[in-house]
């Protein structure tokens, strides 16, 4: 019998309040919306803070994530949470871009890391225009970077959320699995580009192409549409019927309406129930992923040294 479906909520990304008045940006708003949406059926939560994706140092703040996550973990100690990371650029090592991910995992917070196993150009281009010269939308991760992120995820006993922006990314994951070095709990996130120009468009044929690569890996997988609506376009329904899971949220959404995260989660829940399934609980999501058990942690004190709060 088909099992429960994981709903991942991507709370905010780079979406601003000017673009959608409902998007949570402060740590307290992030915590509140995450908790409310978890009650509605979300079992994985992903958020950004206000650091830009392209920075001079590549560093993101640990303290900002702790401020947002602590209320969630107080209510749900086994919650599955993961941050973003700064985009790669020449001269900025992965150790800097991934430092906050590593520190959160070291503390046992969230239970997940993220691994983006390759490089990709991502840009918002419309009307058939050519991307402008000097565009900074190149997201770079070398083979060495990927090795670092997978190896540290395994050492930290954290489940990697693996972002697939191009089909070749799946082949890199397959190499790690074949070598027996893919960390436990890995989940494949298939990202399709609607308004954002990268990878494959959100069509049934594109999903089939991905599944030809993904299904032999026998890993849990989900679908997301960047710059679109994964439910409205029909991709979520096809994915669920094929055994996949779904990601929704204001990081990804683009459409004619101005929904809240709550409305997007409810939309996913309705679809799942119409298909005779149910949303996964946190415990069920952990079981589906095969994620390592949640490690105990204490409340994080308000003060800490520079390394811990960077």
Whereabouts are the PLM-identified features?
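Active-site beta->alpha loop and helix N-cap motifs at the rims of alpha/beta catalytic domains
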Residues: 59-140
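C-terminal helical cap(s) of enzyme catalytic domains, especially alpha/beta-barrels
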Residues: 123, 257-279
């Amino acid at each position: 019998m088909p099992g429960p479906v994981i709903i991942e909520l991507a709370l905010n990304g780079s979406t601003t309040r000017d673009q959608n008045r409902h998007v949570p940006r402060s740590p307290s708003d992030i915590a509140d919306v995450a908790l409310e949406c978890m009650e509605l059926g979300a079992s994985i939560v992903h958020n950004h803070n206000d650091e830009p994706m392209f920075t001079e140092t590549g560093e993101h703040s640990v303290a900002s994530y702790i401020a947002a996550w602590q209320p969630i973990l107080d209510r749900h100690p086994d919650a599955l949470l993961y941050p973003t990371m700064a985009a790669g650029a020449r001269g900025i090592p992965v150790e800097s871009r991934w430092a906050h991910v590593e520190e959160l995992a070291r503390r046992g917070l969230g239970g997940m890391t993220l691994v983006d196993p390759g490089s990709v150009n991502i840009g918002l281009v419309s009307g058939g225009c050519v991307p402008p010269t000097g565009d900074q939308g190149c997201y770079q991760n070398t083979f060495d970077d990927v090795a670092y992120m997978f190896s540290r995820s395994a050492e930290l006993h954290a489940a990697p959320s693996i972002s697939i922006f191009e089909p070749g990314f799946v082949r890199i994951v397959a190499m790690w699995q074949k070598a027996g070095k893919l960390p436990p709990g890995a989940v494949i996130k298939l990202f399709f580009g609607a308004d954002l120009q990268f990878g494959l468009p959100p069509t049934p044929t594109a999903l089939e192409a991905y599944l030809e690569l993904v299904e032999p890996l026998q890993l849990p997988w989900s679908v997301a549409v960047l710059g679109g609506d994964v439910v409205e376009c029909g991709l979520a329904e096809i994915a669920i019927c094929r055994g996949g899971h779904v990601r929704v949220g204001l990081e990804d959404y683009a459409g004619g309406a101005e929904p809240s995260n709550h409305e997007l989660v409810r939309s996913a829940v309705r679809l799942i129930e119409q298909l005779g399934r149910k949303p996964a609980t946190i415990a069920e999501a952990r079981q589906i992923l095969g994620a390592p058990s949640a490690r105990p942690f204490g409340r994080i004190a308000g003060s800490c040294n520079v390394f811990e709060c960077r």
